[in-house]
Amino acid sequence: MIAIYPGRFDPVTLGHLSVARRASGFCDRLIIAVFDNPAKPGLFTAAERVDLIKQSVKDLPNVEVHSFSGLMVNFARRMGVSLIIRGLRVGADFEREMEMYVMNRRLDEGIELCCLFSEPQYQYLSASLIKEVVMLGGDSSGLISEHVADALKNKLASA
């Protein structure tokens, strides 16, 4: 089975990576798909986010990382995907994922959704919260990988 784990990953967190690692255990092939939205540019470019994730999952042989723009369902169809993986942190995530599930099923009935609950230590972790903590000089250890922390500090210093 080929699955896709889509997101912005700006930057990728240990919560994201936990979901990816767990999903890779039950998929033949997992595609981490970095959403590149020109209308809403992130701190990191799509290429930078792809590179940071590739460094983070290099020990997972069945995981690949790509960027995409446009509808995720169209990208998933092109990649032969049959399952969307999403991580759920808090209740608001469930509502948002349900909305997306209904729309994705309308666009392509052949793609299913699998939601994985975040591990407890990542329940309230978000990329935007991490950016704020690092920008204000806080410690990001245990929240993002060391190479991501270095890239984030460098990016914020040059912004």
From Swiss-Prot:
The record marks H16 as: Transition state stabilizer. Its EC number is 2.7.7.3. Substrate binds at K40, M72, R86. Its cofactor is Mg(2+). GO terms for biological process: coenzyme A biosynthetic process. ATP binds at H16, G87, L88, R89, E97, Y122, Q123, Y124, L125, S126, A127, S128. It is found in: Cytoplasm. It catalyses: (R)-4'-phosphopantetheine + ATP + H(+) = 3'-dephospho-CoA + diphosphate. One of its GO terms (cellular component) is cytoplasm. The keyword Ion transport does not apply. Keywords: ATP-binding, Coenzyme A biosynthesis, Cytoplasm, Magnesium, Nucleotide-binding, Nucleotidyltransferase, Transferase. Coiled coil: none annotated. The keyword Transferase applies. Gene3D superfamilies: HUPs. It comes from the Bacteria. One of its GO terms (molecular function) is ATP binding. Pathway: Cofactor biosynthesis; coenzyme A biosynthesis; CoA from (R)-pantothenate: step 4/5. Belongs to the bacterial CoaD family. Reversibly transfers an adenylyl group from ATP to 4'-phosphopantetheine, yielding dephospho-CoA (dPCoA) and pyrophosphate. Homohexamer. This is Phosphopantetheine adenylyltransferase. It comes from Dehalococcoides mccartyi (strain ATCC BAA-2266 / KCTC 15142 / 195) (Dehalococcoides ethenogenes (strain 195)). The lineage of its organism: Bacteria, Bacillati, Chloroflexota, Dehalococcoidia, Dehalococcoidales. The gene is coaD.
